[in-house]
Amino acid sequence: CVGCAFSALDNKDIQAAYNYIQDLGGKEQATIIGWGTKENLPQATLINSLLVRALDYNDIYWEQDPSHPSDIIPAVLSTGEFMKKDGKEVLVGIIIAYELEMRLCLAAFPGVREIGWHHATLTQLVSPVVAGRMLGLNEEEIVAAIGINGSSHFTLGGVVAGHLTNMKNAADPFAVEAGVQAALLSSKGYTGPVEVFEGKEGLFEVMDKVKWDRDILTKGLGDSFLINQCGYKAFPTEALTHQPITAALEV
């Protein structure tokens, strides 16, 4: 994760994003990897997640849906730094991020990617939980944060279809940033729909072209951890290119 971030510091898209964040300014709350400067929590989360994702080299989990769970780690790092959490708490936050993201990748048949949605649609439901926990939110506040983010950040699959732009590697980081924003809003008393999954016009009802196995989301939670099943890339390229690259190298 951190290695991917440092390796991406000279990317043009990263430079553009960093300049954008510098122009915005704000309170110095969390550190930007590589630069060492500090920005407010959402902005630091965004640029750090962009750094992790920029080279397309970070980890991958692909079952019914694909995902890059390490995109969410910057939400843990920024809020953890701000709240002065110790290493144990940061590790717990990372494990929670992986567990929830990967369970969502298992729960839809077919995956949401198969019906035209990007996996950031799943990340938007995970990032507020992780950020909320690190910020010390109670259960009611975390539910509100999920509702805030989960009702407002569905992402079209078009970001990875056809001619690719910088949004290919930015869609998930934006969902991570938004999760931190949602948690911060909730901490101030802001509310969101509490049944964003199962309620009227919620996730399960609106995405009715897939069948959701709700038990996958909670069954055996805490007994074992999916983070151990996440994969790593051999090349800094899109996952589906790895087979032809390997074949070419062996010819």
Predicted regions and their residues:
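N-terminal core-entry segment
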Residues: 1-227
